[in-house]
């Protein structure tokens, strides 16, 4: 009888642990622009990483609050934390673009959005995407990797 109870408790505990590890994939990385059409050797002092971006898509029918979430790149210091109250609307995209300090660069200056609903664009200076490849991850506010892409 003791063996039976221990078996049932072990089974129950393992199911609970598996349920906690599994993360629902509702925010996905839908696009990565790691090599923008900007000429990377335009002129001395012109930042070459402007135009790089990561696009996220909300698969849910409800808005998702990204407060406390992070976007991570390949380097140890490449961590962008979403500002408080950052919302990604249902079935919508959110773009996180690189913007070199004091460059005044706007993604709208580089890409045309004619005929498309305007997407929310956040600018950051933490993640510079490698042209030779890396892994980019979306991490929720409790540390679970919600999605990642390796290119």
Per-region residue spans from a language model:
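Short amphipathic alpha-helical "recognition" segments used for binding
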Residues: 6-7, 59
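N-terminal targeting leaders only when they are immediately followed by extended low-complexity/repeat-rich tracts
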Residues: 7-10, 143
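Positively charged n-region of N-terminal signal peptides that target proteins for export
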Residues: 1-4
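Activation on beta-sandwich/Ig-like modules and their edge loops
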Residues: 19-151
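Hydrophobic h-region of N-terminal signal peptides that target proteins for export
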Residues: 9-18
């Amino acid at each position: 009888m003791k063996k039976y109870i221990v078996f049932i408790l072990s089974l129950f505990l393992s199911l609970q642990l598996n349920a906690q590890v599994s993360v629902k994939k509702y925010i996905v990385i839908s696009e990565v622009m790691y090599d923008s059409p900007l000429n990377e050797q335009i002129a001395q002092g012109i930042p070459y990483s402007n135009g790089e971006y990561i696009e996220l898509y909300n698969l849910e029918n409800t808005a998702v609050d990204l407060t406390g979430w992070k976007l991570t790149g390949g380097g140890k210091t490449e961590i962008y934390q979403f500002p408080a109250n950052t919302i990604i609307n249902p079935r919508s995209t959110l773009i996180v673009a690189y913007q070199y300090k004091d460059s005044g660069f706007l993604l709208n200056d580089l890409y045309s959005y004619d005929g498309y609903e305007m997407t929310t664009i956040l600018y950051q200076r933490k993640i510079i995407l490698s042209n030779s490849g890396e892994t980019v991850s979306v991490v929720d506010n409790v540390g679970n990797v919600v999605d990642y892409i390796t290119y």
